[in-house]
């Protein structure tokens, strides 16, 4: 399988569903890795990496309840949010997509984007 995408981008604490510009198809192999630090805007807390507040589970007010708050998460235009953290490798499968493509979006698992600082540097590779 050849690499069809190898892209670096920045996801800030302010970004809400940042469009990566990447189209993903059924059967694509996706590798996402992230580094960097954000401060979520919660007083008396420190910065965190893309894994978010490990040991905590986000409440229903966050985009991905149950995942670590303030972690890096993603979604496809046709689906639900999924946890990425510092890295994710998987084959994309969607039974209803057929031969078409869907767009990849990234964000922080935060209900109040814009009240903190910092960013994650993300590398996305897609093999087809």
Task: Describe these PLM feature segments.
Residues 1-128:
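Gly-Asp-aromatic-enriched flexible segments
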């Amino acid at each position: 399988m050849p690499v069809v995408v190898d892209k670096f981008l920045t996801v800030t604490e302010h970004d809400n569903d940042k469009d990566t510009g990447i189209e993903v198809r059924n059967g694509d192999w996706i590798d996402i890795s992230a580094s960097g630090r954000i401060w979520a805007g919660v007083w008396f807390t420190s910065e965190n990496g893309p894994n978010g507040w490990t040991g905590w589970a986000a409440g229903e007010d966050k985009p991905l309840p149950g995942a670590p708050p303030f972690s890096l998460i993603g979604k496809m235009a046709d689906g639900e949010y999924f946890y990425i953290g510092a890295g994710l490798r998987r084959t994309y499968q969607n039974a209803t997509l057929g031969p078409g493509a869907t767009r990849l979006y990234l964000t922080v698992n935060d209900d109040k984007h814009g009240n903190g600082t910092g960013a994650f540097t993300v590398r996305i590779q897609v093999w087809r």
